[in-house]
Amino acid sequence: MTAMTIIQDWNPEDRGFWDRSGHAVARRNLWLSIPALALAFAVWMLWSVVVVHLPAAGFRYSTNQLFWLTALPALCGATLRIFYAFAVPMIGGRRFTTLATASLLLPAVGIGLAVQDPNTPFEWMVVLALLCGLGGGNFAGSMANISFFFPSSRQGTALGLN
């Protein structure tokens, strides 16, 4: 398959198809998905680490505000999972993985810039925390994408690695 090939017919349950070409395509997609999902998880959980150090860096947020910054990525990620699960069939797995992974740059770079100034408004931090939820939403899309490629007898291993 070339880089621009669109899968027209995929039947991983057909042993002949799986042995001929299916396993190679599935394996390639899995190994590309694993680092993308690791990055998504890192961005999603970033606030759990950042919040602990904000007071020492001079940020004067209340305890309540710090808890909100920690909770918002999970709330946003849980909501986005609904939409991301349907995105893969609509736009394609390769395009989804590329766009979803690229979208993680915005919160990652944003946090890197925001934590340099203790006068960063709390509202900006809330926006960045919500954007980190993109990482959580990536999980649903990634699982839907990878499970499509493997026969049911191998989906558990693939999803576990992913």
Placement of each model-derived feature along the sequence:
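Juxtamembrane helix-start elements in MFS-like secondary transporters
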Residues: Y61-T70, P121, M125
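Loop-to-transmembrane helix entry/capping segments in MFS-fold secondary transporters
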Residues: T63-N64, S152-N162
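Central cavity-lining transmembrane alpha-helices of secondary-active solute carriers
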Residues: W68-F86
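Cytoplasmic membrane-interface "Motif A"-like loop-to-helix N-cap segments
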Residues: P89-T101
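C-terminal ends and interior cores of transmembrane alpha-helices
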Residues: A102-N119
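Hydrophobic core of transmembrane alpha-helices in multi-pass small-molecule transporters
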Residues: P107, P121-G137
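Intracellular juxtamembrane helix-capping segments at the cytosolic ends
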Residues: G137-P151, L159
